Amino acid sequence: MVAGRPILRKPDDRRLQVAVSQVSGARSGTDRSVPLDLGFLSLSSPMPYTPIVATLGYVLSPDRSEVLMIHRNARPDDQHLGKYNGLGGKMEPGEDIAACMRREILEEAGITCESMSLRGTLNWPGFGKQGEDWLGFIFLIDRYAGMPLQANAEGTLEWVALQRLMTLPMWEGDRHFLPLVFDDDPRPFHGVMPYKDGRMQSWSFSRL
């Protein structure tokens, strides 16, 4: 800092520089090229990762022997057509992730969450129909109020025995993380599962 003014550091050679032509006078017709530092537009800066943020919830029956699943069989153009999945959807502006989960369960199943816990987070690069990235917050709902709907606009709702869950048609990646949702380890898991052309490419996770 010199006399209250910041010291401007010279950009390195990796910074983007462009030449701007200036006319030195209307009558002279001569040009002078002046280097313009646009270091703040450095080409080496990566684009920010902006996945779609969503929730995915699994509702347990009162005796904890069954889980409420949606069979996506209503829309022919559904990316999930024919598969079983938990309930959930995209987070909306103005709500936190827990509020998003409660809203989605109410909208999709007609019940109110009374007790739930965050079981994990999952980063799904490339999972979307057009290759969009998704970031999911996965909840287990162990107490609710109301009577679940039998169906919604996406498909039918079915109580499935936990022992039979892995026999259902589902995304191949779900078979890897679902055991972590229902096991006895109290620690949430945090995983990454890249997809390409609808197929899981890899899977890793940690627990804290």
Model-derived features with residue positions:
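Leucine-biased recognition of intrinsically disordered, low-complexity hydrophobic segments
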Residues: 8, 16, 36-43
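Charged phosphate-binding loop/patch that engages nucleotide di/tri-phosphates or the phosphate backbone
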Residues: 184-208
